[in-house]
């Protein structure tokens, strides 16, 4: 499964190569998960991370070309220091966040619904369940969200409220 990290490519499926992710993780304290993974799993996690980032984030600016497969590179974007970002690069914070997210995806399926998440309380007598509107799992780890601050709007999982449970 070859990875295609061609900038603005029509069939690109990752923002970074395995080599770029390896370089990022070489400076990371918790590197064992990444270094223990096979190249195939690294590629899969990078592709999945890229896809999920594009699904969960409305990036600042506009796609540079209509033909590019991914949402980056983008036009009309400034970095956190207000410098214009070139339309022929993937900014380093996006690359680093992709690598970080890919490592998290190797550890667990962050797209799965965690059991019990969102439940505020459960009463056994006459059965009562109260759901929390704020206790919902997010696909993007907090560190990845922090790394991407200022690069777009992050959309979390749909929030939910309470439902009526009827005992039969």
Enumerate the language-model features and the residues they cover.
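Divalent metal-cofactor coordination and adjacent catalytic microenvironments
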Residues: 1-168
